UniProtKB/Swiss-Prot annotation:
Natural source organism: Nautilia profundicola (strain ATCC BAA-1463 / DSM 18972 / AmH)
Region (RNA binding): 251-257, 275-279
Top-level taxon of origin: Bacteria
UniProt cross-references to InterPro entries, sorted A to Z: ArchSynthase1/Queuine_TRR, TGT, TGT-like_sf, tRNA_ribo_trans-like
Similarity-based family: Belongs to the queuine tRNA-ribosyltransferase family.
Active site: 90, 270
Catalyzed reactions: 7-aminomethyl-7-carbaguanine + guanosine(34) in tRNA = 7-aminomethyl-7-carbaguanosine(34) in tRNA + guanine
Keyword Oxidoreductase: no
Stated name of the protein: Queuine tRNA-ribosyltransferase
Length: 378
């Protein structure tokens, strides 16, 4: 993987990441394709209509169904899905954490029961890497020990220690296997700034046979904490992350979350929000959120967002989307998802342009000003 910083404005960064499959201009939003597909969209939509340079797949879900070995036999995620650009795969730690009583964390790894059929499985750091090799993702996340917040200092400390040990085991396994995939470590520590520093410094210091991690992520946020506390935690963490490697904030979030994190030095983002909100009838616009089911759109011939040039806004009206949503037509999910993802992808492109031109603060001020014009659902 190649990485370069193109411009810095304050702490906001515009960078370029090159993998085997694509060039990624940051800040970047990565659509979530949990089961090797972004919900309601296919690879052509992602490449030709949305021009997304990278999407996510999920190790936990793909391991259980259809199985990572099957995907490997069918050409990895790129051959299997038809999406020929970059894939990042999560380790499955968050999904295991979400299983509640059906999961057990030990120093060796994670025992869990499948949400599909109740069968019992074990993820070690090494096994997760092997699964990700079968998926052949461009960027592989290591297994981490994610905990609920708030939590005790003892449990947060244990999470950091275990996450660091698992990261080192992952790095050793990766180097010894001699594969070319890129490996990212995940910083934990809850919302305790000192624990975040310890976690970041511990992970950054890890090396094996001269190899270190290709990038670093901030994990364990956006799990119920107040927004400002999340922003403060990010701000307390990024100074301890290498300047010459990508910085990824996992599972975040709203447009506001993204612009605040960019201001604090983050490069990469993912979240299910654009597609989930689309399916539920909430569409992102320059001025706020539009609830498409509202009766006032029944005869509205205007596009979702007059400032948007996405495929949906160029070709279809609010009235048509209102009808499709109420009729529960499957076409609605595709058109709405295209719009919301375009909004996110275009949003980070605009942020990048502002950074390159040295006007990030002005762009941020304008962003909030436009949303304040109609902060309620329109």
């Amino acid at each position: 993987m190649e990485f370069r910083i193109d411009s810095i404005d304050g702490n906001a960064r515009a960078c370029t990441i090159k993998t085997e499959h694509s060039e990624i201009k940051t800040p970047i939003f990565m659509p979530v394709g949990t089961a090797a597909a972004v919900k309601s969209l296919d690879a052509i939509d992602m490449m030709e209509i949305l021009d997304a340079p990278i999407i996510l797949g999920n190790t936990y879900h793909l391991y259980l169904r259809p199985g990572d070995e099957i995907i490997s036999k069918l050409g990895g995620l790129h051959g299997f899905s038809g999406y020929k650009r970059s894939f990042l795969t999560d380790s499955g730690g968050f999904q295991a954490f979400s299983l509640g009583d059906n999961v057990k964390f030990t120093d060796e790894g994670i025992w869990f029961k499948s949400h599909i059929d109740g069968s019992k499985h074990f993820f070690s750091p090494e096994k997760v890497i092997d699964i990700e090799y079968n998926l052949n993702s461009d960027i592989m996340m290591v297994l981490d020990d994610l905990i609920a917040l708030p939590n005790t200092k003892e449990r947060i400390k244990k999470s950091i220690e275990r996450t660091t040990e698992w990261a080192y085991r992952s790095l050793v396994h990766h180097v010894n296997r001699g594969k070319k995939n890129n490996l990212f470590a995940i910083i934990q520590g809850g919302t305790d700034f000192e624990f975040r520093r310890i976690s970041a410094e511990s992970l950054v210091s890890l090396e094996y046979k001269g190899y270190t991690f290709d990038g670093f992520a901030i994990g364990g946020l956006s799990v119920g904490e107040e927004n400002q506390l999340m922003y403060d935690t990010i701000e307390a963490t990024t100074p301890y992350m290498p300047k010459d490697k990508p910085r990824y904030l996992m599972g975040v979030g709203t447009p506001e979350d993204i612009i605040e994190a960019v201001e604090r030095g983050v490069d990469m983002f993912d979240c299910v929000m654009p597609t989930r909100n689309a399916r539920n009838g909430y569409l992102f616009t320059t001025f706020g959120t539009l609830r498409i089911k509202n009766a006032k759109y029944k005869l509205d011939e205007s596009p979702i967002d007059p400032k948007c040039n996405c495929y949906t806004c160029r070709n279809f009206s609010r009235a048509y989307l209102n009808h499709l949503f109420k009729a529960k037509e499957l076409t609605y999910f595709r058109l709405a998802s295209i719009h919301n993802l375009h909004y996110y992808l275009n949003f980070v492109k605009e942020i990048r342009e502002a950074i390159l031109e040295g006007r990030f603060k002005e762009y941020k001020k304008e962003f909030y000003s436009l949303r304040a014009m109609n902060s309620l659902e329109i």
